Amino acid sequence: EMERVHWAYVTVHSPCQLANPVLVHEKSYIDGKWVNALNGQTQPVYNKATNEVLAEVVDQGRQDTEMAIKAAEEAFQTWSKTTPHERHNYLLALFAKIQENAEDFARLIVAENGKAISDARGEVNYANSYVQWFAEEALRIQGYTTPSPNPSNRTTVIRQPVGVAALIAPWNFPLAMITRKVAPALAAGCTTVVKAPHEAPLSALALAYLAEEAGIPKGVINVLVSSRGKNESEMGKALCESTLVDKLSSVSYTHLTLPTICSV
C-alpha cells in the first residue's frame, strides 16, 4: 500500500512543501461548506513523481452533483443582482489571494500534475491573468442601441447572466483551465459548478478555499470531485440532465467528451 504523505512533514527539498498548508483540502466545496461524499467514498491523489499518496479526496456521484447545482441555482438569485463593480472587486480580491499563494500553487501543481516547477509557476501566472482580465471585463459588460429599419423603432440589446454554469476541467492545466472558465462566469453574474479533474483536483479545491477567503458568497463557486468510472458518469449525466444548468463548458479528456458525458 502506498505511503500517505503528511503535508506538515514533507522534506524541505520536496516541491510539495507549502508555506500555507491549509490550501490542501480533501473534501468538496458545496454551498460554502466543506463536505464529504454522500456515498462515503474517497479516492487517492498521487504524487506524479514518486507515486506516493498526497491526499484521499472525495469520490462523488449524482446526489452530490444535484446538491451543488441546487446551491448554485439559489446563489444565482442574489449573485446575478450584484453590480459590475461588486463583481469586479470580488475577482480582484481573488486575484490578490492567488498572488499571495502563487508559489504554493506551483508546488501543488508539480506534485499532483507532474509538470516542472518552471512550467507550474508559468501556469499559476497564466491562471491568475484570467482572473485579473475578467475582473476588468466585468466593468465593460454593456448593451447597445442601434437604428431599426422602421424609423419609429430602435433595437436595444441588454446583456444578462445566463444562470448556472457547469464547468468540466482537464488534468493538464488543473488551475488555469478552471480560472479560464470560472472568472468570466463570475464576471457575467453567473454561478458555477466545477468538476475538478480526478487526477489533479487539489488545485481546484485550493482555489475554492481562496475564493471563500476573498469573500465570494456561498454557492457562487462549487467544486466536485469524482473518480473515473461509475461516479464520473453519474456526475456528467446529472450536469447534462439538470434543468437548473443553463451553460455547460468542457475542456475534456479523450474518454470524456461532452457527447460521451451526456449519453452515459
Predicted regions and their residues:
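Conserved beta-strand positions that form and line the central face of beta-propeller blades
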Residues: 44, 56, 108, 119, ...
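Histidine- and aromatic-rich ligand-binding microenvironments
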Residues: 30, 44, 56-67, 215-220, ...
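Glycine-rich loop-to-alpha-helix module at the N-terminal edge of alpha/beta enzyme cores
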Residues: 52-142, 152
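Rossmann-like NAD(P) dinucleotide-binding subdomain of oxidoreductase/dehydrogenase enzymes
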Residues: 143-256
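Terminal low-complexity tails and localization/encapsulation signals of metabolic enzymes
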Residues: 2-56, 89, 93, 125, ...
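Single conserved hydrophobic/aromatic residue that forms the stacking wall/gate
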Residues: 255-264
